[in-house]
């Protein structure tokens, strides 16, 4: 919406490159900045940035900087206090381990702790039906609200992809919020749908 501020947040991101000074570049956040045009500082976007391209629980253990839920929560609240709209990206799927020490944090714990409603992002291609339905059923069983599905890598008129979308909607009861083609730079979606 015009005149509103937007921001991005992700609890943990792994597989990041280093700058010449040795600091890590939060790659996903940098990509979001470039594509969306938001001016939010990178350091607000993600409290945990790891070099190793592993699940966050393993990257954090190797790098000696485990995720703490309080840090994730406080960072999210600070971003929410500053911006009108905040999009939170998951780290892997809903069952992805974020920390596996005494805390045993999975992505579902982050979603629950932050009180988030979710949008399921799925590939439109082969194999998506099982993945989408299992994720949706798991989230429903654990009382994690889902608003709908966005399908990526969509090819208009592709018989299999169109059927995948139909089957996902039918089997989950969730609406398709958008079909995103490779190279799309705008997402046409009503804010009321999210």
Stretches with model-predicted labels:
Residues 58-62, 186-194:
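Short, surface-exposed amphipathic charged segments that create phosphate/polyanion-binding patches used
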Residues 1-66, 70, 77-78:
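N-terminal phosphate/diphosphate-binding loop that engages ATP/GTP or pyrophosphate donors
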Residues 169-188:
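Beta-strand-loop-alpha "switch" segments that mediate conformational coupling across diverse proteins
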Residues 85, 90-173:
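Conserved catalytic-core segment of NTP-binding enzymes
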Residues 23-30, 137-139, 165-168, 194:
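Short, hinge-like loop/turn segments at secondary-structure boundaries
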Residues 44, 72-82, 104-109:
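Short, charged beta->alpha transition segments
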Residues 56-58, 82, 86-88:
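Long amphipathic N-terminal alpha/beta scaffold segment
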Residues 7-11, 42-46, 86-90, 120, ...:
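General beta-strand structural signal in soluble alpha/beta enzymes
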